[in-house]
Amino acid sequence: MENLEVMVILFIIVILGYVACKLGYMGDKFDKKLSSMVVDITCPLLVLSSVMGDELPDRTLILPLLGVGFLTYILLLVFGFWVPRLITRNHDDQGMIGFALMFANVGFIGYPIVSSIFGPKAIFYAALLNMPNTFFIFTAGVMLIKGEYSVKQFNPKVLFSPALLGAFVAALLVAFGVHTPDIIARPVTMGGNITVPAALMIIGSSMAKLPVKEIIGSPKVYLSSFLRLVVVPLSIYFLFKVCGVSDQVNDINTVVIAMPVASFGTMFCLKYGRNPSLITEMTFITTVGSIITIPLITLLFS
């Protein structure tokens, strides 16, 4: 019941963004600037804040967690580039669907859900599992959104993107057992906390610009959403279960992967001048659907 309540609360913020756009408080120009601020400023702060608690995770788990995280995203990379070709022949749509299948809304929705299910300490493990997400979303994710699948399109500057640098610093803090002074941790945490409502309201605002028939979705949207919410997380869960990954790590990783489509999809579309309609539809449908699927998936852990 608690997990369902958290999902409903987050969805209400999406609706708030929808209403704000309809009332004229949000729109294309504002959303684009807010998206850039979330991507480049508040999200890196959110990543850093996840390792600025009183207790740090067991250092011996850092490499295993990173290993599981990277292996997960390598599998998702293959899945994200191959499966969309079976769903549609439209090149641009393939990229959008691939992004949706690969990247879950971990930083914005995943951390609160992980905390509510496994306790506040588990957010540190989720942050480590999510580090590969930060790398791949700013490399493969950008390629998918832009529709440029060649490795030649890779920009080395992405390795120095604020979000990835934030993840590197977070890993160093954990590895060396650094406890951040409260005078630094508190403003970082406050800045990072802007990410969740801002990102969700951007989704709602983008949704407000869609015709009703697009909000309702199309067969490919529902198929992609089902793959995102059910097939992908269950496949990852049972695969690592068979491979002998510890229940604690596997359970947290599964919840991380079971989140709805990452808000970065919509924000990347706005940032790179792509049509956000399809990715926003999938984000909306998966956000609504996850209210049911995430609590059901957690039944595997009981």
Q: Which residues does each predicted region cover?
A:
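Alpha-helical transmembrane segments of multi-pass small-molecule/ion transporters
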Residues: 1-302
